[in-house]
């Protein structure tokens, strides 16, 4: 199973929290101390908590569960998309639209519209329109792709959320809580851990740290899915030749 060591975390800067004046007292159990007015996260807490979260993600993968990766700030955006694609999962990396989970019926209509426009752009429909109308539809399609492209093939609500920066993505976490969807989240010293089922206390700004969380999560999901495939193959009597 994919596990992350303290050495990996130190190298990525996972232990550097925010400035002490911005702290959230609810994060006190996960803070080791402060250095130069910056909180230091206790990695002796983070390592087992993160590895427990990864073990749970392996189980989600085994059940072919759908995981929605959420990270809309600049430091996380690209890495979130890459991790979701690498693990055949889904993502929101531009802006969280209120109601993305709690008002999924409306979101489904927008996804339907996006798919219609995608077909029109390739089947010659756009060519039959006036230049202005074609441009308007292209812009509409691009706008929808930007906000919904990562979930257009999700086909329903996710089984779990994996969030980078609990503070920044508090609306997504609240929606998941309302629907009983488990939340895995990186929670920095300035964030509120309430509503997070699997807390990963750590730096949520350093790109190397963000990539560490996401790569490990993607690997765990893929491992779980492959386990399931291997089990089915064994059951059916398919054994790969050496």
UniProtKB/Swiss-Prot annotation:
Belongs to the universal ribosomal protein uS2 family. InterPro entries: Ribosomal_uS2 (IPR001865), Ribosomal_uS2_bac/mit/plastid (IPR005706), Ribosomal_uS2_CS (IPR018130), Ribosomal_uS2_flav_dom_sf (IPR023591). One of its GO terms (molecular function) is structural constituent of ribosome. The gene is rpsB. Signal peptide: none annotated. This is Small ribosomal subunit protein uS2. GO terms for cellular component: cytosolic small ribosomal subunit. Keywords: Ribonucleoprotein, Ribosomal protein. Pfam families: Ribosomal_S2. Coiled coil: none annotated. It comes from Vibrio vulnificus (strain YJ016). The keyword Ribosomal protein applies. GO terms for biological process: translation. NCBIfam families: rpsB_bact (TIGR01011).
């Amino acid at each position: 199973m994919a596990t992350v060591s303290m050495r990996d975390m130190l190298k990525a800067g996972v232990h550097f929290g925010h400035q002490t004046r911005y702290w959230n007292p609810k994060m006190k159990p996960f803070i080791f101390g402060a250095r130069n007015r910056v909180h230091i996260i206790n990695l002796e807490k983070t390592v087992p908590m993160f590895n427990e979260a990864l073990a749970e993600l392996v189980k989600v993968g085994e059940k072919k569960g759908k995981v929605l990766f959420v990270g809309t700030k600049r430091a996380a955006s690209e890495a979130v998309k890459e991790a979701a694609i690498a693990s055949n999962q889904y993502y929101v990396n531009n802006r969280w639209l209120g109601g993305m989970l709690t008002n999924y019926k409306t979101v489904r209509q927008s996804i339907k519209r996006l798919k219609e426009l995608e077909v029109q752009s390739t089947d010659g429909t756009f060519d039959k329109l006036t230049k202005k109308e074609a441009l308007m539809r292209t812009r509409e399609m691009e706008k929808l792709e930007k906000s919904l492209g990562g979930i257009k093939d999700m086909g329903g609500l996710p089984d779990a959320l994996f969030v980078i920066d609990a503070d920044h993505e508090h609306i997504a976490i609240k929606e998941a809580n309302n629907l009983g969807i488990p939340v895995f989240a990186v929670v920095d010293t300035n964030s509120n851990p309430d509503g997070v089922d699997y807390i990963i206390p750590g730096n949520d700004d350093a790109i190397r740290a963000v990539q560490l969380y996401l790569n490990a999560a993607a690997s765990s999901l893929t491992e779980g899915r492959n386990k399931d495939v291997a089990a089915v193959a064994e059951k059916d009597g398919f054994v790969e030749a050496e």
